[in-house]
Amino acid sequence: MGPEMRLTRICCCCCLLYQLGFLSHGTTSGLQLTPDLEEWEVVFPALWRRESLNATGLSGGSSDPGSGRSSGGGGRGQASGSSREVRSVARAPQEEATRGQSEPWFGSPLEPGAEDEEELESQELPRGSSGDTALSSGTPASWQPPLPPQRPSSPPPAQQEEPSAEEVLLRIPALSRDLYLLLRRDGRFLAQRFAVEQWPKPGPDPTRATADPGSSLLPDASCFYTGTVLRHPGSLASFSTCGGGLMGFIQLNEDFLFIEPFNDTMAIIGHPHRLYRQKRSTEEKVTENSAVHRHHCGVISDKGRPRSKKIADNRREKRYSYKLSQEYNIETVVVADPAMVSYHGADAARRFILTILNMVFNLFQHKSLGVQVNLRVLKLILLHETPADLYIGHHGEKMLESFCKWQHEEFGRRNDVHLEMSTSWGEDIAAVDAAILITRKDFCVHKDEPCDTVGIAYLNGMCSEKRKCIIAEDNGLNLAFTIAHEMGHNMGINHDNDHPSCADGLHIMSGEWIKGQNLGDVSWSRCSKEDLERFLRSKASSCLLHTDPQSLSSVLVPSKLPGMAYTADEQCQILFGPLASFCQEMQHVICTGLWCKVEGEAECRTKLDPPMDGTDCDPGKWCKAGECTRRTPAPEHLAGEWSPWSSCSRSCSSGVSSRERKCPGLGSEARDCNGPRKQYRICENPPCPAGLPGFRDWQCQAYSVRTSYPKHALQWQAVFDEEKPCALFCSPVGKEQPVLLSEKVMDGTSCGYQGLDICANGRCQKAGCDGLLGSLAREDHCGVCNGNGKSCKVIKGDFNHTRGAGYVEVLVIPAGARRIKVVEEKPAHSFLALRDASKQSINSDWKIEHSGAFSLAGTTVHYLRRGLWEKISAKGPTTTPLHLLVLLFQDQNYGLHYEYTVPSDPLPDNQSSKEPGPLFMWTHAGWGDCNATCGGGERKTMVSCTKIMSKNISLVDNKKCKDLTKPEPQIRKCNEQPCQTRWMMTEWTTCSRTCGKGVQSRQVACTQQLENGTLIRAWERDCLGPKPATVQRCEGQDCMTVWEAGVWSECSVKCGKGVRHRTVRCTNPRKKCVLSTRPREAEDCEDYSKCYVWRVGDWSKCSITCGKGMQSRVIQCMHKITGRHGNECFSSEKPAAYRPCHLQPCNEKINVNTITSPRLAALTFKCLGDQWPVYCRVIREKNLCQDMRWYQRCCETCRDFYAQKLQQKS
C-alpha cells in the first residue's frame, strides 16, 4: 500500500478525532487511575485503527521536519501531570512549533518496566505514517498520529477486509483492564426531514420556531456511534459526541458502564467525564413479586377489553393471517416539557435527548427481539411554556390521557398512511406512530402526588390515534431504558414478571429494569419476543410497515470515585435543586439511600437511590456498592487452614453452620485468602414449636427488649424489604414505618417469605429445593422439585366489578392449588379478603390487616398493601378451598387479576371435587338512625349474618353465624350542628349493691353549646323536655351464692295430707351457686278446706204409670271422712233433686167411675195441708193436681188450683 493511500486514511481518522471532540488547545487532560477503584474519570480515551499495524513503526521512524516532530518509539518526554495522563491531541500552532524544536514527540526507545507500561497506556495509537496531514478549515493545527509501540495489550489482529473510514477503535481503561470499542457512525434513528422546534420561539415573537439549517439546534448525524466491545460477543456500545464530550453506555456481560461529562458544557477542550458502573447482583433473588415494577412503571390497559397480559404461556396461539415483515419502523415525535428544557437548557436538552434516543434505537436492534424494529425520530419539540390544553402534573394517568389528546390534535391530522401529510412540520412528513413526552415532573400513576414511578404507557397503544403515547421521567442516562421499556408496553409487550416462565430473568421488560438498578443484559426475553410477534401479526401494527424513506447514510460505526468529587449536599442539589442538602438525621443509613432535605420542607425526601460511590459515611470510610467500607484496601495473602464447623445458627428449623480461615502473617488487617474466607452449609433442626414468632419478628422483638424504652418492648414487627432481603427492617406494630435496625439479619434467616434461600453473613445464599446450599435444584410452577412444569395447568382470569358495596365473592380457589397470585390492576379504595373452611381469614369481618404472612388453608399466604394497591400470593398447596372476596366501599371501576395452578391429572373418584358449601360471615348491612337531632350524635351499622354462595349474597338468620366472632358496629358521627340548649348527662354510677337490688345515680345539667364548641351551663327551664332521671333502680349481679326460690304451689289434695312444689334457680351470673345451700323444691302439706261434699241417693220410681211424671232422690251435705251431716257444702255445687220422667201414654177412654170431680174431692177429702210442700208447687205447675194421688199429698196447693179454675169458668 502506497504512502498516498495511507495518508488518506490518516486524514479521515484525524477528522474523526476532531469531531469526537478529543482536541484541546494545549490543555492537559486524560485518564487518572487508582488501582483499588473501579470508577474512572475519562477526559478522552485513545483512538486506535482496526487495520494492521506497521511493523516498522513498532520500534521507531524517521524524522518529519514538516510536522515538527521526530519519529521514535519513546514517550512524550517531560509531560507534566500523572504518568497515566493523556495530553490533548491538537495544540496551538505556536506550541506545536516550539514543541517541534525543543521537545520531540517521540524520543529514545522506552525502557522496560513499570514506567514503560504506564506511559504506553496513555498514548493515542491510531495507525499512520509520516507525511503532512491537513485538517479542514478551522482546525487548530495539523497533526500526525504517532505509531503504536508493541505491547501485550495491543488491539486484536487486523481484519482481512478493508476498513471503512467511518470506523474508529476507542480504548477505555475500566474494570481493571482495557476495553477496545469498535464504533461506527450511526444516525439511522433520525428521519430524513428531522426537525427541532421550540414552542413558543424565544424572543419578542413568541411563535413556533423551526431550527434553520446550520442552527445549533439541528444535530449532526455523524456524531452518533454504535458498536461493540472487541473480544466480547453480545456486548453493545452506544455513544454521542455531539457536544464535544462523550455520552453513552457500554453493556458488557453483566456490567453496565455509563459515560457522561461531569458538567453540561461539553466544550471542545478536554475536561473530566464521569464513568460509573451498575452491575446486576448475582446474589439477589428475583421473585415473582410484580409490586416492584408496578411501583416504578405504569401500564394502562384498554378500558373496553381485557388486558393482553393475561395470556397463558403454554396455550396454543391463534394463527394470524398477517405474516411478519423483515423490518418495522416507528415514526416518533418526542416532546420535552418546560421543566426539562429549563433544567438542562435548550441546547443541552436537545443533545441529551438525542443521545438517549440513539441508545433506545440500539436497544431495539438487539437480535433477541427476533425482528428488526427501527426508531425513526421525526421531530423534537422543546416546550418553553406548557400549552393551555396540556396537563403536566403529578397524576400520571391524567397526564398521559391529556398528552395523548394534545398530540392527536397537533400531529394526528392525516388522510392515509400511504400519503404525505401537510402540517406545520413540513410538506412530506410521514404519519406519527408514537409520541413520547419527557418530563422532569415527579408523577404517580393513579394519584395526584409524587412517587417513584418513572414511566407510563398504554398497553397495545402504538398506531392508535389516541393511545400511542408514552411518558418518561428524566432520570439521567437510565432514561433510555425507561423509554425502551415503555415503548415495549406500547407495542403489546407485558412485564416478564407477568409470565411465569420468564419471571426469573433480568431483561429489558423485567420489573427490575425500570428502576435502573440491578441491570441484567440488554436482551429481550422469549416472552417479550412472543408478545411483540403477537402484536405485529395483528392489524393494530399496520402503521409500522410504512415509513418515511431514510436518506441519511446508514453506516455502522477513573482516577476518582464520583462521590469524592460531589459531596452528599451537592448530590442532593443535583436531585432536588439548589435548596436541597443532605438530611443529617439519616447519616447512619447514608449508604443505603440518599435522603435530602429541601429548605422550607419539614420532612426529608429520597429517590431510593444510594449515593455515589466514594461519598463519606464514617471517619475513614466511604460508601461503595451501598455499604460503608474502609478506605484503605486490604492486601492479598495466602490461604490458611479452615476452622471446624460452627454450631447451627438456630436451635429449631433450618439454620446455617459456617467455618472460616485466616491467612497467616498478616495480622488483624487480613481480609480475604485466595478463594472464599468463609463457607456455609445448611443444618437441620426439629421444627419450631407452634405459637413462636417468626425468626425475623423474633430478632425485631429482641432489639426492642434491648432498647432503653421499656414501653416499646415487644412492640416491633419485621418488615421485609425486597431490595435488601438480608437486612433487618422493623416497624412498630400497627404502623407502616420500617426502620433499618441492622445491615445483616442473623445467619439462617430466610431471604424472603417464600423460597428456600437463606441469609448468611448478610448475603442471600442460594439453596435448592433438595435442601442443599448452593444447589441449583428448583421447583417448577407445579411444585415439583426439578420438574418439567407439565404436571399442572395454570388457571388465570380477571374480575371486574363496577357497582355495589360490602363483600363480593370473586371465586373459590380449590384445594391443591399452588402459585396463587391475586393482584389489583390499579390502586382502589377497596380491600382484598380471603377465608378458608376453618374460618381463618384476612380482612374479613370488616377488620383490615397490615401487610404480613398469614396461615390459611394449610399454606402461608402473603398479603401486601402499599398505599391503595394490594397483592395476595401463596406458594401452596392449599388443603381446603379458599374464598377470595373483595370488600367494596363505593361505586367504582374495580379490576383485579388472579392466577394459580392446579394438578393436570383428575382427582380419584373418592376425591372428586365437590361444589364448596356456602360461606357465612358477619357483614354491616346498613346504618341505623342518629341518636341525636343536633349537637353531635352517633349512628351505628347494623351487623347481620350474610350467606355467600356462588357469588350470590343474601341475609340469613343470625344463628348461622353464631360460631363466628361478631364484629362491633361501626360508629359514625351525625347531626353535628349545634343545639341551642340540651340536657347533658354523665354516665351512671355503679350499683349501690354488688348483689341484689340497689340504686345508681348520675349528674344531669342543662347546657348550651357556643359557636366555638364550648359547653356552658344554662337554666334548667331553658332545656326542652323533662329533666332526665338522676336516680334509677339497679341490681347487682356480682353474687357468689344467690338461690332464688319461687312461690309454693297449692297442696296436691284438698282434704287430707299431700305434697306442694316450688321452682328454685341460681341467680349468680357465673352460675356458681353452692349446691349445699339450695332450698327445697317440694314438701308435705295438709288441707281440709273441702271435706264436706253433697251426697245423693238413688232416683225414685216415676210418680205415674203413664204420661209425664217426676222422679226424686235424697241429697245430703256430709263430711268425707266422718260421715256427719253439715251445712258447709257450697249451694252452687248442689246436684238436682228432681227430674221429669216419661212413660207410655195414658188411655184416653174415660171411666166415670174413676173420675172424682175436684169439687167432690175438695168436699170429701179433709185437707190437713201439703205433705210435700217443696214439690207441690212443681205438681201444680205440671197440671198434676187432677191426679188424686198428688192431690192428696198437695191438697192445699191443689185446692187453690181448682178454686182458680172454677172462678175462670164462672
Swiss-Prot record:
It is found in: Secreted, Extracellular space, Extracellular matrix. Its cofactor is Zn(2+). Residues 794-917 are annotated as: Spacer. A motif (Cysteine switch) lies at residues 295-302. It comes from the Eukaryota. Residues 1-30 form the signal peptide. The keyword Protease applies. GO terms for molecular function: metal ion binding; metalloendopeptidase activity. GO terms for biological process: aortic valve morphogenesis; collagen fibril organization; proteolysis. Residues 143-158 have a biased composition (Pro residues). Residues 55-166 are annotated as: Disordered. Residues 1163-1202 form the PLAC domain. It holds the Pfam family ADAMTS_spacer1. Keywords: Cleavage on pair of basic residues, Disulfide bond, Extracellular matrix, Glycoprotein, Hydrolase, Metal-binding, Metalloprotease, Protease, Repeat, Secreted, Signal, Zinc, Zymogen. Glycans are attached at N54, N263, N800, N910, N931, N952, N1012. Residues 328-548 form the Peptidase M12B domain. Its main location: secreted. The conserved cysteine present in the cysteine-switch motif binds the catalytic zinc ion, thus inhibiting the enzyme. The dissociation of the cysteine from the zinc ion upon the activation-peptide release activates the enzyme. This is A disintegrin and metalloproteinase with thrombospondin motifs 19. It comes from Mus musculus (Mouse).
